[in-house]
Amino acid sequence: MMKKLLLAVAATMLLLSSCGTHKTVVGNSNIVNYTEAHNFFHIGDESRPIIKKITSQENLAKEFGEAAFMGKGGEPTKINFNKYFAIAYILPQTNRKTLLAPLSLTLKRKHLELQYKLEKGKVQSFFTQPFFIIVVDKKYVDYKIVEIEGWD
């Protein structure tokens, strides 16, 4: 009885691990690596959700200010625009508690799919402008970016 149970568990684990490995290999083939930039605030006032490509320090300074603070991790992310560019996804101002975060960036034939997580919460007594900035290898700068709301 114990041998049958052990054999069934081993067979199940083998089956699950072989399926998982295949999905990982196929699924990761078009993933584009990125780093999320931190400690910035948006200067403009967007009236609708928008994706912006930022290809220079000058463009970054026009769109975002540095929001440094004392302590570990307080410096704004440095971006080397000779090697990288930034993708900013910006929402209009809102008085709702909002979580906006990138989930993945995937290369499709002639475009990049930017998948993000958006959660809207309770009304607050103040307004914020949700956004995120990701830093991507410059070899992808000419691709169109398509947004896809996703789930974590």
Show the residue positions of the predicted features.
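Bacterial Sec-dependent N-terminal signal peptides
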Residues: 1-26
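Exposed, flexible binding/inhibitory loops of compact, secreted disulfide-stabilized domains
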Residues: 19-152
